[in-house]
Amino acid sequence: MTAAVGLVSVTRRIGARPVVDDVTLEVRERELLTLVGPSGCGKSTLLRLIAGLERPSSGTITLGGLDVTDVAPERRRIGLVFQEHALFPHLTVGRNVAFGLRRLDRRRRAERIEEMLELVRLTGATRRYPHELSGGEQQRVALARALAPDPAAVLLDEPFANLDASLRDELRADVVAALRNRGATALLVTHDRDEALALGDRVAVMRDGAIVQVDRPEVVWSAPNDEFVAGFLGPMSLLPSGDGQFQIVRPHQFELVIGGDGRVVEREFRGAVWRHTIVRADGTQLIVDAEPGRDLEVGATCAATVRPGHLPAQLTRR
């Protein structure tokens, strides 16, 4: 199957430094691929390369199997959604959504505007202006505008980063629903590991300009390629299991036992659980979650064992 978006050996250098380093990646038709990594790893630059806002130093970019490496941004049929909304403040919501619909006649344009606003749950907002909308509503308009021309792909760069937590969760669900309902192909950039795992059909993890793992969320979580991926996706403890192998044990996979060679040096309330930092006699540090009532105070001696039925991932430490 031809990839909706394809990159082959794409590199972008600034001076001698590769900001994007030999990236080969594909986004499949109707797939939502999340691209996650720490700040400054090259995620947004990769998005800009796909959109045509920057040119690669080397490599090939395709859309629907067609080479667009040297094609101007406006001819790539790409929808863009940024974290700062980028709406035209002097235009109404309807005219913002209509911006990429100039080839449609007036009747079809009006129908498409209403269709897109219904899709993002903003029916009736056609004549309002951006300054009259909340941050979440502005982001919905930005998505409607990106989807309106039926783009080959939608690129979303940290679209929820400027929103408070409750609004972010609600908008996240609505945006994903709109993309699914439209059958859109999408690449969503985020530095939020929980967001990447929750939203993506597949997750691509980026570090220092390179893609270090691409797979389904549950595979990336449970079978990380290396220690960086394992640690970036969530807190963990590394336990030696022999022959240079280590077990990756997540906090919820441990069970606390009173008494032993460990000592609780720190604990933090996380709502559903208390998170403990435990240091063993040999200096090994463990991160262990326990439900309220099963938690231990700082200074308590304890041991931590892997819960029955939990199979920690294996990792060769490099």
Regions found by a protein language model. Name each.
Residues L32, P73-G79, Q83, L87-N225:
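ABC ATPase nucleotide-binding domains
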Residues V36-P38:
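The feature captures the beta-strand-to-loop junction immediately N-terminal to the Walker
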Residues A51:
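Helix-to-loop junction immediately C-terminal to a conserved catalytic motif
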Residues S57-T60, D208:
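Conserved coupling/switch loops of ABC nucleotide-binding domains, chiefly the family-specific signature
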Residues G59-D67:
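Conserved ABC transporter NBD signature motif
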Residues Q245-R318:
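Non-catalytic connector elements of ABC transporters
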